[in-house]
Amino acid sequence: MLLGQPAQKSEVDIVLVALATPVLVGVYQDGKRIETIESHKKTSDILPSIFQSLMKQYEIKSVYFARGPGSFMSIKLVYIFLKTLQIAKGITLFGCDGFEFTDNQPIKAHGSHYFVKENDTISTKKLEGDGAVTFRLPDSIDEIRCSQENIAPLYVLPAVKV
């Protein structure tokens, strides 16, 4: 390193799960998680500051993100935010369905309705009990199935009874 030149930033991948509270962000180097960020703030409030901080510290190569199902507004916000980063910074995006981060457990939809995944089909079902699911970040990026081709939001809207 020459005097007066900034130190080279480490290249990392990011995993983002913002389908519910808390928002989870994992920083991965060589495929292994080296840092975890968890926030109970609104996605719209915390996402820009998290990524601003990460971009100061690291060179982000790619972002793996839960594209749904879950909070409709959060899904939309995350997609627009990450798509902007992809265009502006050349960051590669990988979309994952949210069940990759719940060990295929139901994801809260609304009231007593939950998103469930059976035979690769996502639907809504009414379930008894609190059904609180805990999202988790994998220790290794190799543990999740994501696609670079399928990054569009995964909106699964429950049927509304009239």
Short names for language-model regions:
Residues M1-I46, K56-Q57, A88-V162:
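Oxyanion-binding and handling regions
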Residues S49-S62:
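Phosphate/pyrophosphate-binding loops at sites that engage ATP/ADP/AMP, CoA/4′-phosphopantetheine
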Residues S62-R67, M73-L93:
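DPxDG-like acidic metal-binding loop motif
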